[in-house]
């Protein structure tokens, strides 16, 4: 008779169960991705020529996500979307390709070396394309020399933004490890 009693001490109701929460690391990733996207879009409308976080974000995306689609397409899609507003130009393919190459080499080189290398590749390819497209009457050497002030701003902005994003990435990693 005593064996037929139910043990109700282990039963619980729905109010006793903790609500399922979204993984905090996913929330941080969503916030970071949204922040990077907004930074990219807003930077395209700044009045300082070639002072932009675009190249730095292309370099740093492999450190923020393993998703290759995001790594390669986020910077290029932002360029394309803002080019719809700003206007298209004849050298878009060369510019877009530079961002893809920067992301590619950032997976194999240090962040800061990639920043220097990416700007050097940018300087050689984009300004070489300007010369080949016969934009202006300058020789190839003159084209490269005339581009130095603009590309120097690109180098400075890329290094600054890589440093900022490096700190952001490390703080996210530290916070994630600390909250585990």
PLM segments and residue spans:
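Membrane-interface helix-boundary motifs at transmembrane edges
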Residues: 24-26, 65-70, 105-114, 174-176
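Hydrophobic transmembrane alpha-helices
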Residues: 12, 23-65, 70, 99-110, 165-170
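Hydrophobic alpha-helical transmembrane segments
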Residues: 30-34, 72-73, 93, 112-117, ...
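Central hydrophobic cores of alpha-helical transmembrane segments
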Residues: 36-37, 71-82, 114-123
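Membrane-embedded alpha-helical hairpins and interfacial helices in multi-pass inner-membrane proteins
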Residues: 108-180
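Interfacial aromatic-anchored transmembrane helix boundaries in multi-pass membrane proteins
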Residues: 41-52, 76-107
């Amino acid at each position: 008779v005593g064996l037929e009693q139910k043990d109700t001490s282990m039963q619980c109701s729905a109010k006793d169960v903790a609500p399922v929460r979204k993984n905090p690391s996913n929330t941080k990733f969503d916030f970071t991705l949204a922040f990077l996207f907004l930074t990219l879009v807003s930077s395209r409308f700044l009045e300082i020529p070639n002072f932009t976080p675009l190249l730095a974000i292309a370099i740093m995306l492999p450190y923020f996500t393993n998703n290759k689609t995001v790594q390669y397409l986020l910077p290029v899609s932002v360029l394309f979307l803002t080019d719809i507003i700003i206007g298209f130009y004849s050298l878009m393919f060369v510019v877009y390709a530079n961002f893809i190459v920067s992301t590619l080499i950032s997976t194999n080189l240090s962040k800061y070396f990639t920043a220097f290398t990416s700007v050097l590749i940018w300087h050689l390819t984009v300004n070489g394309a300007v010369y080949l497209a016969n934009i202006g009457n300058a020789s190839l050497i003159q084209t490269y020399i005339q581009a130095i002030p603009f590309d120097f701003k690109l180098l400075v902005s890329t290094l600054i933004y890589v440093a900022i994003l490096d700190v952001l990435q490390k703080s996210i990693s530290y916070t994630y490890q600390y909250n585990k």
